[in-house]
Amino acid sequence: MLKFMAKYVVLALLLMGCAGLDMGKENLEKFEDTSEAYLMALRWGEYETAYGFKRRPNSYDEIPDFHDLRDVRVTSHRIKQTIISEDEMTVMQIVDFQYYRMRNVTVKTITDRQKWEYDQEKKRWYLMSDLPNFE
């Protein structure tokens, strides 16, 4: 009888582990979608939209003035590295952006180090780092 119970306990633990893997996979798929939407917002100059991916402790915090970014044109981006934490709740992503400013058409490259965290309660990813500093 003890062996019989032990088999069911092991089976239940395996099933719970598999369910956890599915949850992790689902969260990482959400991250890919979120990251791509964020990168596309930057690519098309939608800086207010990109800022909406940031976690703000207080929704009444002052939103930055994006006026200085209106002449920035991102020509391309390339994800260089993605580092996923062991618990799959934090992702560090390193992205190269090529861009220029309308007043000076010299193409520049900036490396952006992004930190993302998953909010289990809201079931979404938040950008914890700042937007790229396009000089």
Question: What are these language model-derived features?
Answer:
Residues 17-44:
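Short, low-complexity N-terminal intrinsically disordered segments enriched in polar/charged residues
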Residues 1, 43-46, 101:
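Secondary-structure transition/hinge residues
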Residues 32-33, 47-92:
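Short solvent-exposed beta->alpha transition segments
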Residues 37-45, 53-57, 119:
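Structured segments of extracytoplasmic/periplasmic soluble domains
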Residues 86-135:
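Exposed beta-sheet edge and beta->alpha loop/turn motif
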Residues 16, 48, 123:
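Glycine-centered loop/turn positions within well-structured domains
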Residues 1-20:
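Sec-dependent bacterial lipoprotein signal peptides
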